[in-house]
Amino acid sequence: MRIVVIGGTGHIGTFLVPQLVALGHEVTVLSRGRRKPYQSPGSWTRVDMVEVDRQAEDERGSFGELVAGLGADVVIDLICFTEDSAGQLAEALEGRVQHLMHCGSIWVHGPSASVPTREDAPRRPLGEYGTGKAAIERHLLGRARRGGVPATVIHPGHLTGPGWVPINPAGNLDLAVLQDLVDGRRVTLPNLGMETLQHVHAADVAGVFLEVLAHRSVTVGESFHAVGAGAMTLRGYAESVARWFGRDADLAFLPWDDWSQTVSEEDARITWDHLSHSAHCSMDKAARLLGFRLRYSPLAATAEAVAALIESGRLPGPDLEPS
């Protein structure tokens, strides 16, 4: 099949695109051309790369027709964040593709009510990002269930893998938190460190996309989680990272109002986003309908990311030997 991947050089595309090529598909990747994949096996030489500014094309109302004009059988959209953008694309692809797959987010759920959260749980999104993703899901699946563009939405957890910084045990991207755990220094966590994170390796997210592609008859009009098996508490995550380096984590705790004054405004914002969701979503639907099995646990996914940071020199430390 001819497959167009929008935003295919990022976290998910790095793992997804080479597998699509290996399966014999003709792949075109649309991107701004500003970033190379985190890993570049030889199969990328067989990918047709098209440089395009989606935001500019959306503002002109031309992006959907640009994609439709490529004559794809399947379109995989990894970088859509507004209902208007999704609607333009879906309208242009109506009757012209076999499948449209959209990358959503588990943040469509908002704060957890009962865990593990299933795909059919009521939507109570928080903030602009989660609200936007929930609106896109409602729009695309509504179209699909009315016989319109055949769409599926895949909701990843906290994307993790070699090449970028994982969400750390404080719920943000500050490398100093990981460095302090490596070196045995005290790390202060918000509240009691019992809020949860649900990391997932980008390779596993790519795997869900591949299974959705292979099971079109049961995936059109549906959403699927793409998350690691189980969630980690901030405290448990910190203790595990310390153990990788033969240490017992030296942890302290502060109420949110006090803790947030000890970090930058940006780190506090990111942490609050993660704490307020405390995600713990189920993978049962993908296992039951698609036969999907995860390759990485959340902890193994973050271990690989941290190991890559050490290898690259971005995180000074000994060789990582997770226990």
Please place each PLM-identified region on the residue numbering.
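A conserved pocket-lining segment of Rossmann-fold NAD(P)-dependent short-chain dehydrogenase/reductase
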Residues: 177-200
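Active-site "gating" loop of Rossmann-like NAD(P)-dependent oxidoreductase/epimerase domains
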Residues: 105-128, 142-147, 164
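Glycine-rich Rossmann NAD(P)(H)-binding loop
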Residues: 161, 189-195, 222-231, 242-243, ...
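Conserved beta-loop-beta element that borders a ligand/cofactor-binding pocket
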Residues: 138-168
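N-terminal Rossmann NAD(P)H-binding glycine-rich loop of SDR-like oxidoreductase domains
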Residues: 3-25
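C-terminal amphipathic/interface module of NAD(P)-dependent oxidoreductases
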Residues: 270-323
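Mid/C-terminal beta-alpha module of Rossmann-like enzyme folds, strongest
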Residues: 183, 211-271, 304, 316-322
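Glycine/proline-rich active-site loop of Rossmann-fold NAD(P)-dependent oxidoreductases
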Residues: 147, 161-176, 212-224, 247
